[in-house]
Amino acid sequence: DNSCTPKPSCFF
């Protein structure tokens, strides 16, 4: 997903 832009939740 590209929704990790507003928050660093893409690392989890």
Swiss-Prot record:
Molecular function GO labels: toxin activity
Keyword annotations of the record: Disulfide bond, Neurotoxin, Secreted, Toxin
Name of the featured protein: Conotoxin Cltx-1
Domain notes: The cysteine framework is C-C.
Taxonomic lineage of the native organism: Eukaryota, Metazoa, Spiralia, Lophotrochozoa, Mollusca
Main localization of the protein described in the UniProt heading: secreted
Superkingdom of origin: Eukaryota
Tissue and organ distribution: Expressed by the venom duct.
Disulfide bonds: C4-C10
Compartment list: Secreted
Any GO CC annotation of this UniProt entry: extracellular region
